[in-house]
Design a protein with these regions (language model features):
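N-terminal small/polar loop signature for handling phosphorylated ligands or for N-terminal nucleophile
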Residues: 58-130, 245-256
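Carboxylate- and glycine-rich phosphate/diphosphate-binding segment that chelates Mg2+/Mn2+
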Residues: 165-273, 384
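C-terminal catalytic subdomain
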Residues: 273-331, 340
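Fold-independent oxyanion-binding glycine-rich loops
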Residues: 33-34, 53-55, 83, 110-112, ...
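An N-terminal, well-structured beta->alpha segment
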Residues: 1-79, 388, 396-397
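Glycine/threonine-rich beta-strand-loop-alpha-helix active-site module
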Residues: 90-193
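C-terminal charged capping/lid subdomain of soluble metabolic enzymes
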Residues: 2-9, 323-397
Length: 397
């Protein structure tokens, strides 16, 4: 990356950092049991809601108690359960049509990040009935108030219940794009560990590492604040203390609750301090090959951190100490390397299958466009430099 563009990126990031405290960020009201949705909707005088989820969650019966509880209290519950792992424009359009057809007055996002992103984007289309998603993508495009939205995460990973972002895939163009504005934050979030009990160990690992990615990228970037640093450190400690327990015993209520808390804290941290190239590259891989976001982040994280090199050693060492992986007496470089090695021990694949060399250039361009100049990464890279990350993560070459 040439000096002029580097200077532009850093200036853009500095201006955004200065402006951030004056922007209307808000935290959702938190509940700890899904049944608390009923008195909430009664208070809001909502008679009909659209519940956005996926077929796996619904077929497992996880949404059934809430559906029955809502209907038993004269609140109509319409279900959209076709959300894909990387929600598509078509998913959002279908969800919107169902909302309008049934005269719904509010939204419930019940699932992982995909269901929450689909519900957020649905709310944006309801707020802007004459626009399509392409007109609403990018930064600060969605200003109108969305319908009341309750986010119920069934994974402890994305933190989408507290973030300003929805990520949607254009299947035709094989491209993922983000919608970013403060109006996209759900009004309410239910952090109920019981709805995460059935999450299989493999997804517990990858979604938990997704949350760790949020904490790490928020912490190592150049737009941190005292609050986001504190939240990122807390989230990192919670994840390292609880992810193995949750992996081995999915019904351990305390471990599941702590993982939800970690994802929430990391979500706030990266909403205010942003992410980096791990996410940008992961989004492009998800758009091109439909690779689950948590898996892509998990595999990419140690590779990108090693690519950053010495520029992140100090901050990684601080994260390592916070996670009690080493002590303050450990040298900065050694502590940073210990942190990266601990990530590699999380039973995550080292490589991703199916990446084609002929796709790398276009994916790198997408990642470059997403990340630069917005993401305050510790070390700037252009599209050509980002291509190396795809080659490092690819199984087949």
């Amino acid at each position: 990356m040439n000096f002029i563009y580097k200077s532009f990126c850093r200036t853009f990031q500095f201006c955004f950092r200065i402006a951030m405290p004056f922007l209307p960020y808000r935290k959702p009201t938190i509940f700890t049991n899904v049944k608390e949705c009923v008195p909430l909707f009664q208070k809001l005088n909502i008679k009909s809601v659209l519940l956005v989820t996926d077929q796996g969650i619904r077929s497992a019966g996880i949404t059934k108690p809430l559906e029955e509880y809502l209907e038993g209290n004269q609140i109509k519950c319409v279900v959209y359960d076709s959300t894909r792992a990387n929600p598509t424009v078509q998913n959002v359009e279908e969800s919107k049509s169902l909302y309008i057809k049934n005269n719904c007055q509010g939204l419930i996002a019940f699932g992982g990040g995909s269901s929450m992103d689909c519900a957020k984007a649905t709310g944006a289309l309801i707020a802007y009935p004459k626009k399509n998603l392409a007109k609403l993508k990018g930064l600060l495009k969605v200003w109108k108030k969305l319908p009341p939205l309750v986010a119920i995460p069934t994974t402890a990973g994305t933190g989408s219940e507290v973030t300003v972002t929805a990520v949607i895939t254009d299947s035709e163009k094989k491209h993922k794009y983000t919608m970013n504005n403060f109006t996209m934050i759900p009004y309410y979030a239910v952090l109920d560990p019981q709805v995460t009990y059935s999450l299989p160990p493999s997804l517990t690992a990858t979604t938990g590492m997704d949350a760790l990615t949020h904490a790490v990228e928020a912490y190592i970037g150049q737009s941190t604040t005292k609050e986001t640093r504190k939240l990122a450190l807390q989230a990192t400690k919670l994840i390292f203390k609880n992810i193995l327990v949750a992996y081995q015993d999915g019904t351990n209520q305390q471990a599941r609750a702590n993982m939800l808390k970690a994802a929430y804290k990391a979500g706030i941290a990266f909403s205010k301090s942003y992410v980096g190239y791990i996410h940008a590259v992961a989004h492009s891989l998800g758009g091109q090959y439909n690779i689950p976001h948590g898996l892509a982040n998990s595999v990419l994280m140690p590779i990108v951190l090693e690519k950053y090199g010495k520029s992140v050693y100090k901050k990684l060492s601080e994260l390592a100490v916070a996670a009690e992986l080493c002590t303050e007496e450990t040298s900065i470089e050694e502590a940073a390397k210990i942190f990266i090695e601990e990530i590699k021990k999380m039973n995550i694949p080292e490589k991703l299958q199916g990446i084609k060399e002929e796709d790398i250039k276009v994916m790198a361009q997408h990642a470059d466009k997403e990340a630069n100049p917005l993401y305050p990464v510790p070390k700037l890279m252009n599209a050509k430099e980002l291509e190396q990350l795809y080659k490092l993560v690819a199984q087949d070459f």
